[in-house]
Amino acid sequence: MLIPRRVKHRKQHHPGRSGQATGGTKVSFGEFGIQALTPAYVTNRQIESARIAMTRHIKRGGKVWINIYPDRPLTKKPAETRMGSGKGSPEWWVANVKPGRVLFEVSGVSEDLAREAMSRAIHKLPLKARIIKREEGDA
C-alpha cells in the first residue's frame, strides 16, 4: 500500500476538490493513460486495487505507471462519539484528484489489451475517467 513514511503534521485540513488539474494532464511515460473527468479523493486501497486489476490483465507484457500518490490523511471520529473533543484520528490516506489529471499509464502492450485493462481499473476508482492515447507532440 502507498503510505507516506514520515509526515510533518499527522492531521491536515481537507484539500479542496474544486478546479481543474494544472499539472500531470498529459501522458508522459507510457502510451495510454487514464484521465480523471470528475474530482475525487482516491484512497491508497483504491489505487492498489486498480493497479492489481491492470497488471493481472496485462500479465507480463507491459509496464504500468502510477502517477498519483496518497499524501493527505483523512480523519474520522469513532462511532457513537459525541461531537467536540477534538479532531478524530487519521483513518485513510488519499490523493486529491482533480479533473484532467492522468492517474495511470501503460506501455508495451497492444491498444486493445491496454483499453481492456484500463477499463477494469476505472471500475475500481470512485470517479469518472476516460482512456487517452499519447499524442505525437507530448514529451
From Swiss-Prot:
UniProt cross-references to PROSITE patterns, sorted A to Z: RIBOSOMAL_L16_1, RIBOSOMAL_L16_2
Keyword Amino-acid biosynthesis among UniProt keywords: no
Species annotation: Leifsonia xyli subsp. xyli (strain CTCB07)
GO CC terms in record: cytosolic large ribosomal subunit
MF terms in GO: rRNA binding; structural constituent of ribosome; tRNA binding
Record-given protein name: Large ribosomal subunit protein uL16
Entry-linked Pfam families: Ribosomal_L16
Biological function: Binds 23S rRNA and is also seen to make contacts with the A and possibly P site tRNAs.
GO BP: any one term: translation
Keyword Ribonucleoprotein: yes
Coiled coil residues, start to end: none
